Amino acid sequence: MLRSLVAIRASRLGLSSHAEPWSQMSLKELKVECKNRGLKVSGKKIELVRRLKNLNITNSNDSHLRIDIDRPKPPRNKSKKQVKPINSNVKLDRNIVLNSRINDTITKENDTTPTINESNVKTSPIEHVQNPPVEHMQEPPVDHFGKSSPIKESKDIITTTRPYANGFSTDQDNYQTNSLALRDKIFLLTSTTCITIWWWWPHMPSFIDQILKSYKYLQSFL
């Protein structure tokens, strides 16, 4: 009870302290103050004091509201902001693990040997066999009975077939004579026919007479 009474008394003293400077002014001064603050000028002294007092109360409330608005607000949900980098690190770790697994599978697939009909195929490098030239080959020893080794016989065969490899064999000549061009054949035919006509032209009338006589003779039998 005592605390409530003290609070009421303090509020009344505050109101009286706010009202005391306005109450000490004259009516003309109050009208000037109301005019400067945009309030009504008409009325009694008590009404003017109330208007000025209410204006001070509203101004004080507005100032409190502005102070509250201008104050920086504390950040909310601090725990969530702290959790975000942890989640991002976890995602990065997962991506690294997935990439490493994919790389392992790719290397394993590349290491495996190709299969044909479910059988492994082993690739081996191609070996080029180089035979030594014939001139540098050593001749084997000849037997006392006059028989040479098969290596010498093969050498003789190679030496005999060398000229034919350069295009001097009879088979190649025959192939060249048989494979005449069409224009060459036409030229040969025309030349032979012209020569025969030129040779047999003086004897042509007698030859024609003989042909006609033989034809008449055959008709006589028919």
Swiss-Prot record:
Segments passing through the bilayer: 186-202
Report whether Transmembrane shows up as a keyword of the record: yes
Residues of the region (Disordered) are 65-85, 131-150
Subcellular location per the Swiss-Prot or TrEMBL entry: Mitochondrion membrane
The lineage's top-level taxon is: Eukaryota
Annotated ranges, domain SAP: 22-56
Where does the record place Basic and acidic residues bias? 136-150
Q: Signal peptide location in the record?
A: none
* InterPro entries recorded: SAP_dom, SAP_dom_sf
The Basic residues compositionally biased stretches are 74-83
Q: Which UniProt keywords apply?
A: Membrane, Mitochondrion, Transit peptide, Transmembrane, Transmembrane helix
Location (main, coarse): mitochondrion
Q: What membrane topology was assigned to this protein in its record?
A: Single-pass membrane protein
Q: Does the keyword RNA-binding apply?
A: no
Q: Where is the transit peptide?
A: 1-12
An annotated GO cellular component: mitochondrial membrane
Q: Which residues pair up as cystines?
A: none
Family according to the record: Belongs to the AIM34 family.
The name this protein goes by in its record: Altered inheritance of mitochondria protein 34, mitochondrial
Taxon lineage:
Eukaryota, Fungi, Dikarya, Ascomycota, Saccharomycotina
